[in-house]
């Protein structure tokens, strides 16, 4: 859900978001969004509402996680904060648990991010054992658009490494709740707030008969569940038979997702080196520049935000997640440039990519800023950079398939210790087994773990900026064979511009890992069919 606001004000140390001409404010409370009207509002416009994710269970039919949070709140002495058995448990209760008995209303306000250090809750949310804690992000503020966005499914990252997990969607449900009154601590927090917020002057001819409704954009494909908290005249004791929308809400739009993903058939340049040179040069400018340039249409501007989400999913914040092309960073190649190189390779092989959207952004930017085109970077430098990525993914594919074919039940190889590498090693073992028609189900548990550990060792070398030489060196040691040296010679001859089978294999392994990272990062790859 998207919530439009016109301005912000800080009151009692908390940021409030002003909407509806000053008649209503939003504020963040433990990852949820509360909507509060101006005092003395009419019954129609005076509704207090709460929007946010609630905790459910391990499956769609149980409430294990919600019941656990209730019991923990009671066990730790926060009885007043524990919802009744009839009420859903909002994620703000997680912040109450994390901060303990000293937590006060203001301490829980102001952020979409929640910290979860309870090992049981962490495992329920991501289906993996986590010892370092989780950061659960329930939404984000987009100040340039004046918009607060609530996620249907949260983004969950490792509190230590920044690794992005795939959430257990059965654990969360987006809910709209009616509140008859605010808790006393929040009443105190907003006391005097509206004294500092002027009411927008209505037009001389106000045909609406009152102040305008608030625009809330519903983007979820599923209806938002509705519930009531406390007694209310508008809700009988009978359960609601359908989802209803708050009186102050006007659903204006259910938009299609911004479609940046496509096949190479729509790449205007045919994925040429010249187009790649231009994109390589201005990639950081067209994505990171804050203000839209003259002539940039709304769809392309929205595409920039979608591309940023994709880059964060693949490389993490500030590029902390290692990926192909790490060796290029030593030559000053940026994370955005590496992303462009990957999209070029995928476009060349008709795999789902966003290279056409990047080209359109570049064309629009050059139309507004012609001097940004020249001089183009050295074509040999750009070609070497994109070739490095296809060769790294190519040797990974070759070595993975050799490992799943010929791994023997020998002493296991030590893993890398990196969560992302170990997870991707498991995925690659299955992918390589399918490609070579090896039945992993016929192998023993120890054999499969040994395969995964060997793949992790190779992957770790590639991600650690050692390139194809480092990957071959570790492969020779763990396989006890010089075959990887011959593979290096073959891989060194492929390029991102040829049509060789080994190049195709590299593109497919690159696509598989990249698409899995997008999935874990919550980025939906919606393919245009226009």
Swiss-Prot record:
Pfam families: Herpes_UL21. One of its GO terms (cellular component) is host cell cytoplasm. Its main location: virion. Keywords: Host cytoplasm, Host nucleus, Virion, Virion tegument. The keyword Protease does not apply. It is found in: Virion tegument; Host cytoplasm; Host nucleus. May participate in DNA packaging/capsid maturation events. Promotes efficient incorporation of tegument proteins UL46, UL49, and US3 homologs into virions. May also play a role in capsid transport to the trans-Golgi network (TGN). Belongs to the alphaherpesvirinae UL21 protein family. Interacts (via C-terminus) with UL16. This is Tegument protein UL21 homolog. It comes from Equine herpesvirus 1 (strain V592).
């Amino acid at each position: 859900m998207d919530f439009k606001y016109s301005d912000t004000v800080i009151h009692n140390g908390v940021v409030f978001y002003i909407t509806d001409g000053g008649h209503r404010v939003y504020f963040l409370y433990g990852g949820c969004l509360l909507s509060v009207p101006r005092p003395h509002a009419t019954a129609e416009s005076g509704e207090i509402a709460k929007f946010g994710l609630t905790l459910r269970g391990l499956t769609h039919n149980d409430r294990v996680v919600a019941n656990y949070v209730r019991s923990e709140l009671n066990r730790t002495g926060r009885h007043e904060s524990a919802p009744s058995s009839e009420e859903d448990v909002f994620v703000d209760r997680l912040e109450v648990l994390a901060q303990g008995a000293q937590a006060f209303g203001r301490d829980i306000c102001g952020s979409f991010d929640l910290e979860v250090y309870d090992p049981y809750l962490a495992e329920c949310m991501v289906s993996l054992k986590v010892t370092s804690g989780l950061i659960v992000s329930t939404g984000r503020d987009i100040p340039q658009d004046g918009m607060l966005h609530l996620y249907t499914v949260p983004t969950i990252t490792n509190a230590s490494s920044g690794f992005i997990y795939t959430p257990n969607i059965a654990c969360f449900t987006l809910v709209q709740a009616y509140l008859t009154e605010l808790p006393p601590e929040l009443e105190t927090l907003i006391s005097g707030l509206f004294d500092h917020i002027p009411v927008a002057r209505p037009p001389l001819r106000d045909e609406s008969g009152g102040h305008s409704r608030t625009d809330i954009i519903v983007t979820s494909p599923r209806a938002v569940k509705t519930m009531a908290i406390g007694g209310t005249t508008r809700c009988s004791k009978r359960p609601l038979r359908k989802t209803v929308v708050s009186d102050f809400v006007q659903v204006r739009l259910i938009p299609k997702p911004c479609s940046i993903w496509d096949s190479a058939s729509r790449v205007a340049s045919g994925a040429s080196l010249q187009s790649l040179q231009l994109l390589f040069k201005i990639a950081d400018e067209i994505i990171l520049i804050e203000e839209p340039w003259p002539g940039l249409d709304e769809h392309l501007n929205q595409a920039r935000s979608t591309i940023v989400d994709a880059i964060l999913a693949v490389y993490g914040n500030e590029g902390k997640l290692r990926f192909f092309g790490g060796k290029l960073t030593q030559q000053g190649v940026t994370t955005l440039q590496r992303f462009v190189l990957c999209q070029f390779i995928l476009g060349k092989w008709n795999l789902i990519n966003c290279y056409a959207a990047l080209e359109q952004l570049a064309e629009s930017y050059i139309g507004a800023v012609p001097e940004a085109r020249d001089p183009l970077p050295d074509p040999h430098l750009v070609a070497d950079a994109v070739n490095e990525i296809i060769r790294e993914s190519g040797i990974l594919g070759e070595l993975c398939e050799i490992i799943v074919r010929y791994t023997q039940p020998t002493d296991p190889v030590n893993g890398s210790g990196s969560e992302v590498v170990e997870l991707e090693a498991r995925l690659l073992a299955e992918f390589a087994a399918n490609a070579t028609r090896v039945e992993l189900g016929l192998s023993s548990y120890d054999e499969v773990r040994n395969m995964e550990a060997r793949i992790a060792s190779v992957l770790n070398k590639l991600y650690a900026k050692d390139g194809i030489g480092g990957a071959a060196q570790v492969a020779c040691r763990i396989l006890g064979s010089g075959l990887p040296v011959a593979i290096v010679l073959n891989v060194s001859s492929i390029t991102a511009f040829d049509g060789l089978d080994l190049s195709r294999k590299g593109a497919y392994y690159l696509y598989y890992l990249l698409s899995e990272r997008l999935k874990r990062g919550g980025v939906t790859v919606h393919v245009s069919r226009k």
